[in-house]
Amino acid sequence: STGIGLIETANSWLKKTSSSADNFEIIGLEHLIGAMANNAGVLLVGMHSSTLDLCGAVLSNHVGFDVMYRRNKNLLIESIMTKSREKNYPNAIQRDDIRTVLKNLKKGHAVWYGPDQDYGRKHSVFVPFFNIETATITATARFARISGAQVISFTHYRRDDDSGYVIGLSKP
């Protein structure tokens, strides 16, 4: 699974994702489209898993959204990832640029945000994630409250039989 994930990630960085869109089922796209129609901004809350880059790029072909990211320390990988972000998303916002995140949400953008990171005890709480106590960032509710954005859960996975991918979007 990890090997497949690396290939999927490389494909999303280097190839056009529209060519493989037939292998994707998007459940709940109408929730994101409806929320975007209100121009209130949408916080797309997701998780970091091996299908993130590929499924995110495919979803962005349907509804463009901004992404938050952490700069990679390896300059070659960062360069490749930057080109991919520029190709697949309207805006890529560094994780510590909170003003831009809030400004874009207030303008009615959708912004992908992954709270499944450990930024230390001051900014995290430990909650069960697949029955394992895991650090989770607590800023999600503050982002939504300050910006007035609606929150939509964005899930994605590869089908067990490797026949394709499922992207899920919750109701706000």
Regions found by a protein language model. Give the residues of each.
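Membrane-anchoring hydrophobic helices of lipid-metabolizing enzymes
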Residues: 1-43, 78-89, 159, 167
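Catalytic core of membrane glycerolipid acyltransferases/transacylases, capturing the structured
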Residues: 5, 38-96, 121-130, 158, ...
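Short, conserved clusters of charged catalytic residues that mark active-site
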Residues: 27, 96-97, 135-139
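Pocket-edge structural micro-motifs
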Residues: 28, 46, 115, 171
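Short acidic active-site motifs
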Residues: 31, 96-101
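Generic beta-sheet signal
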Residues: 40-46, 109-113, 149
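A cross-family acyltransferase "interaction/gating" segment
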Residues: 73, 110, 117, 121-172
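Short acidic alpha-helix that forms the nucleotide-activated donor recognition element
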Residues: 100-106, 145
